[in-house]
Amino acid sequence: MDNKEKEDEELSDELKDQPGPSEKPRTPTVVAFTKPSFYRVNTVISDVKVCRSMSYDMCGNHQQELLFDLYKDETTGKVYLPRFFKALLESGIRKDDPRIDKMIQNIKDADLLDDFVWGTQHIYLEKDTFKRYIGSSIGVVTKALKKQMIIPDWERFVSDMGEIFEDVRSHNEGDLATYIPQLSRVAPDSWAMSVCTIDGQRKMWGDALKPFCLQSVSKPFTYALVHDDIGPEELHAHVGQEPSGRLFNDISLDHNKKPHNPLINAGAIVVASLLKNKLPLADRFDFMIHACRKFVGSGYIGFDNSVFLSERETADRNYALSYYMREHKVFPKDLNLQDTLDLYFQICSIETNCDSLAVMAATLANGGVNPMNGERIVNNRACRDTLSLMYSCGMYDWSGQFAFHVGLPAKSGVSGDMIIVIPNVMGIALYSPRLDKLGNTVRGVKFAEQLVQKYNFHNYDSLIYSDNKKIDPRRQLKDDHDGQNRFMYATKLGDIAAIKRFLLMGHDIHCKDYDDRTVLHVAAAEGDVVTLEYVLSKWQEDPNPCDRYDRTPLDDAKHFNHTACVKLLEEAITVYNLKGQDD
């Protein structure tokens, strides 16, 4: 077995296990270039010149052709699928992403793959087949490979998040919830986390597929659904919006004789009483289960009947709350109190896992639209009001401290689950059943605190004139000159993956800097044979251009005694000159 076959086999095995970010990228394969048949125009938007391709208007397949040219194998002239999918994985697009389901199914239907697209077979696709198979997913594929997702440097981000996750694992303080017998029997040291961005980038750590009950984390979603259904005026005629300053199950009402907010037990019971309350109890529960399944998309939603029965048998406090509120006429008229409480207990007993819960949180971060399938679940106003309540009331009696130190909407539950929503960026789900004295997951709170120490996610970290040194991992809008500089720098580093990305984004490989130097000058001066060979394979003009000092790439290669680069450039110049004579 030669070295290339061995590398391909190792790559297939690595992808099959769906790893985290690799420590060092492999040397990319040098490929031949076929110039795509499209042209570009310049568009001015708000005084910023932006390049955009007109080929989409003329010919809908130019992106497929460009992707093929950028990722095809040097030897076979075909795309090696595991390597192509690895590039997607490194951008945050997982193999179970529903947006690439059709693409993967097309390949499976052709009997080219086994059950896992990241299988052990060496799969190569020719151009027409490749274009046909990826056409249904070209939007998300192109966006991912262009690094235009909300978190462009996904590998670095998941590496940092993994470090925080492992650091927080050492916190073993806290106790299990005991007032619900079933919750007191779970494994106390379980620790899980999952992230889902508004662009559908996903990653999970630890016991992220282990099921647990939503408990109080269901409350924001129930509130959002009722808000979307009946509107904020009718909803808040029965429940307030203020932090209570009391325990989550305290028997008390605000000065208007309403529960303080929808995220404590009293408020959540009232919200449950408003959920499709014209329907029979069974239909109301069906509505809630189906709504949760819409929130998770293709993720897991179940129901733990034992927790439901256990909670109903030990719910004296919630019964007392409900009778107290009925005395003060908080509920809508003609209410069946037992049905309302049963529905509330059922909603708390809905089961999911960290990986699916992250998608639910990301749906809130995305304005009520599921990022995995684009389906709107709740309207934007309902989502906005939900996040406002989570920010001020989501962490029981620690809500004020959490808003001050972390500055993000969040909600915790006594099962040990917790969600953090970073609006317009991502949702984070955490699970660790050890709770502090206020009922919040200890590790979840510690994670949130460390998260905002590293990243500028706090609601007020982005104030102007800020002097903090926190990282902003979000995609930044760059002008053309900045992109050109980064293109040159990628060439200096020999980062062929980045060079491919810049070409896919429409950057001109022949562009020059302020000294009229090109990427050929940079690669030749660095003596990077692999990068120089790749750049030459894309070069369509004279491969020996002069800079402002009349120095050519060949001059630089000779000056620094890079003999292999000299040979490459001389061969390219000869081929170019011969082609000119033929023309």
From Swiss-Prot:
SMART domains: ANK (SM00248). ANK repeats lie at residues 482-514, 515-548, 549-581. It is an enzyme of class 3 (hydrolase). GO terms for biological process: glutamate biosynthetic process; glutamine catabolic process. One of its GO terms (molecular function) is glutaminase activity. The keyword Glycosyltransferase does not apply. Belongs to the glutaminase family. This is Putative glutaminase 3. It comes from Caenorhabditis elegans. The lineage of its organism: Eukaryota, Metazoa, Ecdysozoa, Nematoda, Chromadorea.
